[in-house]
Amino acid sequence: TPFPETYIRTFTDADGTTARIGFIGLTLPFNKAAFVTYTDVFTAAQKYYDQLKDSCDAVVAITHQAMDDDIKLARQIPGLALIIGGHEHERHYAKIGNVYITKADANAKSAYIIKLNLNKKDHALTIKADIIDVNEKVAIDAATDVVVQKWTGIANKSYASLGFDATKVCMQNGEPLDGREAYIRTQQTNFTRLIVSSIEKASPAADVAIVNSGSIRVDDILQMPVTQYDVIRSLPFGGSIMEVDMKGSLLIKI
């Protein structure tokens, strides 16, 4: 069954007053596959907003695209109530006209608590957005935890089928390993040095080891002990180490 192009949910408050909130979803066309049809994000957004706006009290866009594109979207469709965004790994907040844009940190390190207050008499909408850090002070939601445990079990079985034991400790002691995107994309860290050293050990005849920093996806600081799961979530794309002979002139260009 295909996903619906739009979604409307009805909310009811304590006195029985109802509000209909429409949702549209947008994502950037990344890693295009031949079996998927892609449309222009902004054209699609306008189309689905126009379909929803007269049948609900507010329209919210849930997006996964660059902040600049979320800003462009807010300017293109000023009637949107809110854009809940993703893609960047650091928190962002902006208000473009009357459109709020919120993005929390990656890896569930933080979350936005967003409250939409709608006056049904004059249709005035006010929004309050607060960001909280997700840590041990935040109580685990029982219903959410059921889903988390279900998918953790599915993931662990999948890892096991590939020969991994997600809970097995690879490194017991040592300093935390810095895999934060803001650092590994611009400089060396102890984690990137460890990865390069591992490749050099696997390919002892190589003079140079090169790693695409974009393949390191953890965007976090790994605390000891480090498990096989930490390795998987740090380098989830897999692939092989390739040894290539090349001239120094080509290496400089790379």
Predicted regions and their residues:
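Acidic, metal/ion-coordinating pockets
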Residues: 1-139, 144, 186-198, 209, ...
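Solvent-exposed loop/linker segments at secondary-structure transitions
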Residues: 115-254
